[in-house]
Structure formats: C-alpha cells, structure tokens
From Swiss-Prot:
The modification Phosphotyrosine is found at residue 102. PANTHER family: METALLOPROTEASE TLDD, PROTEASOME SUBUNIT BETA. Residues 1-45 form a propeptide. Induction: Up-regulated in fibrolamellar carcinomas. This is Proteasome subunit beta type-4. The gene is PSMB4. Non-catalytic component of the 20S core proteasome complex involved in the proteolytic degradation of most intracellular proteins. This complex plays numerous essential roles within the cell by associating with different regulatory particles. Associated with two 19S regulatory particles, forms the 26S proteasome and thus participates in the ATP-dependent degradation of ubiquitinated proteins. GO terms for cellular component: ciliary basal body; cytoplasm; cytosol; extracellular exosome; mitochondrion; nucleoplasm; nucleus; proteasome complex. The 26S proteasome consists of a 20S proteasome core and two 19S regulatory subunits. The 20S proteasome core is a barrel-shaped complex made of 28 subunits that are arranged in four stacked rings. The two outer rings are each formed by seven alpha subunits, and the two inner rings are formed by seven beta subunits. The proteolytic activity is exerted by three beta-subunits PSMB5, PSMB6 and PSMB7. Forms a ternary complex with SMAD1 and OAZ1 before PSMB4 is incorporated into the 20S proteasome. Interacts with PRPF19. It is found in: Cytoplasm; Nucleus. The modification N-acetylmethionine is found at residue 1. It comes from Homo sapiens. It is linked to Proteasome-associated autoinflammatory syndrome 3: An autoinflammatory disorder characterized by onset in early infancy and recurrent fever, nodular dermatitis, myositis, panniculitis-induced lipodystrophy, lymphadenopathy, and immune dysregulation. Variable accompanying features may include joint contractures, hepatosplenomegaly, anemia, thrombocytopenia, recurrent infections, autoantibodies, and hypergammaglobulinemia. Some patients may have intracranial calcifications. PRAAS3 inheritance is autosomal recessive or digenic. Keywords: Acetylation, Cytoplasm, Disease variant, Host-virus interaction, Nucleus, Phosphoprotein, Proteasome.
Length: 264
C-alpha cells in the first residue's frame, strides 16, 4: 500500500492541487504555447461575428432621407433573434442603420449616445451634424481596423441639416462615401440596382415615392436573401426631426414557389 501511495505521489509531483488547473512551466518553448501566460498572439475574437444583421437601405428624397432595415439577428444561418432594431436615432437631425455584428453595433450606439449627451451638456446651442457623425465614424472605424481589431459593421448615416439631405456610407475598414442611394450587405447586389434604376429616371423623389421604393426593395430582399426577414423598420428624417416606424411587414406572394426547382 505504501509503495502504491509512493508511486502516486511520484506521478503527481509538481502537478495541480485538487480543484486547480495545471500551469505549464515557463520555459523557452512556452513562448509558442497558447496556454502559456507568455504567449502573446493577435486578438482574434472579433474575426468571427456571432449575431449579425443583413442589408440596410437608404434613399434621399426632396427634404429628407429614408432608411430601412429588417429586424432579424442571425446566429450563423439560424434566424435567432427576430425583433431587434438595427436603426438608431443619433440626434434630432441624424439617424444611423447598421449591418454586420450586432454586438459591435450596440457598442457604437453606446459611444454615440454618450457623445451626444456630452455635446448637449455644453449648452451652446450646437449639436453634431449628419456630416460630422459620418466623419467621426470614418475615423473610428479606420482606427479600430488599424489596430487589427475592427468593428464588424457597415453603416448608413442619414440626416437633414441646413436645408440639405445627407446620406453617407462607412464600412469596417473606414471606407466612406456619399450617394443618393445606398445599400449594404446582400442589398448592394439586389436592391441597389433597383434604387439606381428609379433615381436615374427621376433624380428627385417625394417622400411617398422614396418610401414606396424602399418597401419594394425590402420585399425583394425578403424573397431573395436567406438572411432577411419580413419584419422591418423604416426611419425618416426631415426638418421636423427623426421618426422611426415599425415593426412593419409587406404582403408577399409565393404562388410561383412550386415552379422553382434545383435549389433544395
């Protein structure tokens, strides 16, 4: 018996105490061991977004901007969260819609919200313009990208200030531009051609026409994008302020579904 206990103590000499974890000794080899405290590799947790949102659409009209995004949060290919908002009101003249990682969008919402509060506390009568918010986001996204720890989002910023409509785009690399119509995600391939087709024929839309166009594109995306959902929000900004409507849905028709084959 004593020999048996002696062999056990020899086997576990230098090992972990009950309930503790084994710590690898600090040797030159441990520099390459991920379990070692000496190992310092790149941050990779942001390279795999968990809950994501798909397309955001934006269109300018005479006197404002309209933005739309569905309310689905996808966990991979699973339609996990079906009632999340991907559009935020930044201030009375600016709104923002985001696709990509929802956790990163929540972080940006918190940061932007605090920025707006800090600005209002000054009490000088000034607030961030849509163009200022767009410019700040380009710097923030590029900064995080340069640190190899990007915010995994593509954003559409819409606003109305000084009698001018503003619609801007920022992606996770800090790439930014302005356009009369914008679409992110799968919408860049399916919805943007539809938006441009209408705007090429009629460059200036009314608010009703812009809203109808966006609703039509949301219906097409629901038909064609497997990560979209028939519940969405539409946000409108005019000189009166920002208004977010929803959840909304569109009427769909699946009568021809039985004719589609080869994609099962």
């Amino acid at each position: 018996m004593e020999a048996f206990l002696g062999s056990r103590s020899g086997l576990w000499a230098g090992g972990p105490a009950p309930g503790q974890f084994y710590r690898i000794p600090s040797t030159p080899d441990s520099f390459m061991d991920p379990a070692s405290a000496l190992y310092r590799g790149p941050i990779t947790r942001t390279q795999n977004p968990m809950v994501t949102g798909t397309s955001v659409l934006g269109v300018k009209f005479e006197g404002g901007v309209v933005i739309a995004a569905d309310m689905l949060g996808s966990y991979g290919s699973l339609a996990r969260f079906r009632n999340i908002s991907r559009i935020m009101r930044v201030n009375n003249s600016t709104m923002l819609g985001a696709s990509g990682d929802y956790a990163d969008f929540q972080y940006l919402k918190q940061v932007l919200g605090q920025m707006v509060i800090d600005e209002e506390l000054l009490g000088d009568g000034h607030s961030y313009s849509p163009r200022a918010i767009h410019s700040w986001l380009t710097r923030a996204m590029y900064s995080r990208r340069s640190k190899m720890n990007p915010l995994w989002n593509t954003m559409v910023i819409g606003g109305y200030a000084d009698g001018e409509s503003f619609l801007g785009y920022v992606d996770m690399l800090g790439v930014a531009y302005e356009a009369p119509s914008l679409a992110t995600g799968y919408g860049a391939y399916l919805a943007q051609p539809l938006l441009r087709e209408v705007l090429e024929k009629q460059p200036v839309l009314s608010q009703t026409e812009a809203r109808d166009l966006v609703e039509r594109c949301m219906r097409v995306l629901y038909y064609r994008d497997a990560r979209s959902y028939n519940r969405f929000q539409i946000a409108t900004v005019t000189e009166k302020g920002v208004e977010i409507e929803g959840p909304l849905s569109t009427e769909t028709n699946w009568d021809i579904a039985h004719m589609i084959s080869g994609f099962e």
